[in-house]
C-alpha cells in the first residue's frame, strides 16, 4: 500500500509570462539534447544563403545576440572549392532553441534577402525588445521604428547589417 500525503503543499499560481518562459526554456533544452543537434529528417529550418561571404560573421553575431544559442556544426570549403578556402559550405546553429543553417553561396545570384520573409520574435519584455531592436538595427535599416501600431504594445521591424529581416513584437 502506498500513502501520499499532501498536507504541506503550497498552492502557488504562476502568471502567464512565467509559464511561457518555462515552456520556452524547456523547448530550448529539448532541442539542445537532440543527438548531435543536427536537423532531423522532415524538420523545417531556416537556411540563410549569403552572397557576400558573410555567413560566419552573421552566424557569430546572432549566436552572441540571442540567449540559449550556439554553433552546432560548420563545414568549410577546401582549396578546390568554388569560393575562397575556409568559407562556409554549410553551417548549423541554434538561436534560442530554433535551428538555422547558413552558407556562403558559390554562385552569385541576382537576388538577395527580401523583407517579404522575416524572422519574427515575440519578446518577453520591453527591455529585451529594445536591446534586440538596437543591436539588429546597428549598421542596418529600420523598416518600422518601435511603436504601438494598434496590434500590440510595441512592434519594430529591421533589416540587419547582413540583409536579414527581423520583426520584433511585445504583446
Question: Can you describe what each PLM-predicted range is?
Answer:
Residues 43, 88, 116:
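Conserved catalytic motifs of the protein kinase core domain
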Residues 89, 98-106, 112, 149:
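Conserved, structured core segments of small domains
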Amino acid at each position: 500500500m502506498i500513502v501520499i500525503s499532501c498536507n504541506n503543499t503550497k498552492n502557488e499560481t504562476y502568471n502567464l509570462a512565467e509559464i511561457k518562459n518555462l515552456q520556452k526554456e524547456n523547448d530550448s533544452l529539448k532541442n539542445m539534447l537532440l543527438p548531435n543537434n543536427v536537423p532531423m529528417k522532415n524538420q523545417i529550418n531556416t537556411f540563410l544563403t549569403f552572397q557576400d561571404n558573410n555567413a560566419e560573421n552573421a552566424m557569430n553575431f546572432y549566436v552572441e545576440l540571442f540567449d540559449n544559442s550556439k554553433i552546432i556544426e560548420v563545414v568549410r570549403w577546401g582549396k578546390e572549392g568554388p569560393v575562397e578556402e575556409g568559407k562556409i559550405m554549410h553551417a548549423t546553429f541554434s538561436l534560442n532553441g530554433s535551428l538555422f543553417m547558413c552558407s556562403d553561396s558559390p554562385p552569385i545570384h541576382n537576388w538577395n534577402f527580401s523583407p517579404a520573409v522575416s524572422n519574427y520574435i515575440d519578446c518577453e519584455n520591453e527591455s529585451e525588445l529594445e536591446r534586440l531592436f538596437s543591436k539588429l538595427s546597428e549598421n542596418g535599416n529600420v523598416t518600422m521604428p518601435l511603436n504601438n501600431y494598434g496590434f500590440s504594445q510595441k512592434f519594430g521591424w529591421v533589416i540587419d547589417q547582413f540583409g536579414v529581416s527581423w520583426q520584433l513584437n511585445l504583446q
